[in-house]
């Protein structure tokens, strides 16, 4: 997908919450925008549709969690299933990104900004990091 101005929504998938970020390939930047509730990994698909339409997204990016040794876990399979359902429901290209350590990095950045109050949920910040990783890969293509 090089040489295109793409608007992407990035997702940090979880069984209870799904973080969402938006970014684009013009500046290769991303912003955390939402945390969606999920029930056993099933989101409110209408809210996702609304986000896609609001931001005019033309590509979706899903973080895929692996164990530190690269092995897969139960959540790995659930995140892939979520990515497939996104593609089937909305007909947009879906990219998957290795999301190891994004939550730890999100916490580090939170405190680095001088924010001392412990964040309740960092899912949308993790989605931002996932999307920034994908945007950097697009820049390097």
Swiss-Prot record:
Record SMART domains: YqgFc
Entry-linked Pfam families: RuvX
Name of the protein described by the UniProt record: Putative pre-16S rRNA nuclease
The organism's place on the tree of life at top rank: Bacteria
Protein location: Cytoplasm
Single GO biological process annotation from the record: rRNA 5'-end processing
Family, per entry: Belongs to the YqgF nuclease family.
InterPro entries per record: RNaseH-like_sf (IPR012337), YqgF (IPR005227), YqgF/RNaseH-like_dom (IPR006641), YqgF/RNaseH-like_dom_sf (IPR037027)
Upper lineage: Bacteria, Pseudomonadati, Pseudomonadota, Gammaproteobacteria, Legionellales
Known function: Could be a nuclease involved in processing of the 5'-end of pre-16S rRNA.
EC number: 3.1.-.-
GO molecular function: nuclease activity
């Amino acid at each position: 997908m090089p040489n295109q101005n793409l608007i992407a929504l990035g997702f940090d998938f979880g069984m209870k919450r799904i973080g969402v970020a938006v970014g684009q390939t013009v500046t290769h930047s991303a912003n955390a925008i939402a945390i969606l509730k999920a029930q056993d990994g099933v989101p409110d698909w209408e809210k996702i549709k609304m986000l896609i339409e609001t931001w005019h997204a033309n590509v979706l990016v899903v973080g895929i969690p692996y164990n530190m040794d690269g092995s897969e876990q139960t959540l790995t399979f659930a995140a892939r299933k979520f990515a497939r359902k996104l593609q089937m429901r909305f007909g947009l290209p879906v990219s998957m990104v290795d999301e190891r350590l994004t939550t730890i990095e999100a916490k580090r950045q939170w405190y680095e900004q001088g924010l001392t109050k412990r964040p309740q949920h960092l899912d949308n910040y993790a989605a931002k990091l996932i999307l920034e990783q994908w945007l950097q890969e697009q820049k390097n293509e």
